[in-house]
Amino acid sequence: MKILIIDECFYTRAGVNTYLNSSSTLTLMDVPTVKQATLAIQNFIPDIIIVNLTNYCRFGGHCPLLAQFINSCGQAKVYIYLDASYPFSEIPIPLTDTVSILAKRHLPKLLQGLSGVSGDTQISSSCCPTSLFSPQEHKVMCYWMTEMPNYRIARKLNISDSTVYSHKRHITKKIKVRNRLELCFIYNVFKYFY
């Protein structure tokens, strides 16, 4: 099984390499940037991609480089980790069938799980793409990130204000954040997957 590690921090890449090198069934490659990873994916064709996208969480606009990277990932299982205390979950949160997100402090637990995976193990991929959010939750989240008030979101979606509030609460519970600011930070990355 091929694993691509992407992190600007040399020590993190070296640590992940050292941890996973004990498994003879894994082939590892590491690169410091998303730009280099986009090129490496074409030749290396990884089964799993472990990537630190913290810097991209700070970029609110559209990032063509990140969009290109995400498109190049194909059917690889992608684990995005962030140098933040959130999401508040000890296990990776699945955003889609192939993409999960976690806080960097839980990276050792992920690596422990990956080191036990044999080369014969196939990564499960569903024939139909799924999402963590319902279509209506996704619409509410998009409007919410533009700072639209509840009553306007409700009017646009033809639902009640309390339903909008309920969707917002479900969104923060699903992504394991406490408030809109934490969600907005993560949203700058996962908006490319929907």
For the regions a protein language model found, what residue spans apply to each?
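N-terminal regulatory/sensing modules of transcriptional regulators
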Residues: 1-123
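Hydrophobic residues on short alpha-helical segments
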Residues: 138-142, 172, 184
